[in-house]
Regions:
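Surface-exposed amphipathic alpha-helices with a cationic face
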Residues: 3-18
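Active-site-proximal substrate-binding groove within the catalytic cores of carbohydrate-active enzymes
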Residues: 16-18, 25-26, 32-35, 39, ...
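Single, function-defining residue in the core of a domain
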Residues: 43-44
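Generic beta-strand structural signal
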Residues: 158-160, 197-199, 208
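Generic detection of short hydrophobic beta-strand segments and adjacent strand-loop junctions
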Residues: 175-179, 197, 204-206
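Solvent-exposed beta-strand/loop surfaces of large extracellular or lumenal domains
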Residues: 187-203
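C-terminal beta-strand-rich structural cap/linker in extracellular carbohydrate-active enzymes
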Residues: 200-220
Length: 220
């Protein structure tokens, strides 16, 4: 029923050159995103004021359902406790999976983020820093095959296009990891820091703080 209804809507919109986007996806309906142009969901990464980011497994489920199509978040949280540091972590984690971080309100009705200049002006530097990189990898296109391995279980890798590899330290500790590429590479540049890591036997060494990320541009 859901598939048939969504498919009918898609066909109707395509016939008039319109796009289809659905909130609350995919949920358990993994079969819906292939019919959509854009998927997204409301989310809250705080539990009674404590930081509880979306897990790597949850991100990967959404990304695998959507393939290389756009995915958007609306953060529905208490903006009194979602400080600038947590907003930056939100954007960093979204970058790793090529998803777009947005904001709404704690109760999806009042106290809208973008009606409060104190909030969005505080976070403007984070928007300006991370959104262009998220757009970069999203346009490059997610690839389910990373062609790279990290020697630490705390490290998550995602591939976008032929050039880009995103890296997340999904732990509470600083991690020094070796990332080995299955292709022949000369070096990898972290576009977030400008630092270049020379490769030895197609392997680079990378040090990341807790919940920190890297956006590597691979040079063959």
């Amino acid at each position: 029923m859901v598939f048939a209804c969504t498919n009918a809507i898609r066909k109707k919109l395509l016939s008039v050159n319109k796009y289809i986007m659905a909130n609350g996806t995919p949920g358990v309906m993994w079969f819906v995103p292939p019919l959509l142009d854009v998927s997204g969901t409301e989310t809250d990464w705080q539990l009674q004021g404590a930081w509880h980011p979306m897990s790597v497994a949850e991100f990967r489920y959404r990304r695998s359902c959507c393939g290389d199509k756009p995915y958007c978040f609306l953060m529905n949280s208490d903006f009194n406790t979602l400080d600038a540091q947590r907003v930056e972590k939100y954007m960093k984690r979204s970058l790793v999976f090529g998803m777009f971080p947005g904001f709404f309100s704690a109760n999806a009705a009042t106290g809208h983020y973008f009606e409060n200049p104190a909030l969005y002006e505080r976070d403007r530097p984070a928007f300006k820093r991370y959104l262009p990189f998220i757009k970069l990898v999203a346009e490059a296109g997610w690839d389910p095959i990373t062609d790279a391995d990290a020697d630490s279980p705390a490290i998550a890798l995602e591939r976008f296009g032929k050039e880009y590899l995103t890296v997340l330290n999904d732990s509470q500790e600083t991690v020094n990891t070796a990332i080995t590429f299955k292709e022949n590479i000369v070096s990898a540049e972290d576009l977030l820091t400008g630092k270049t890591y020379p490769a030895e036997n197609n392997t680079i060494s990378l040090n990341l703080n807790s919940e920190d990320v890297a956006l590597l541009k691979v040079r063959s």
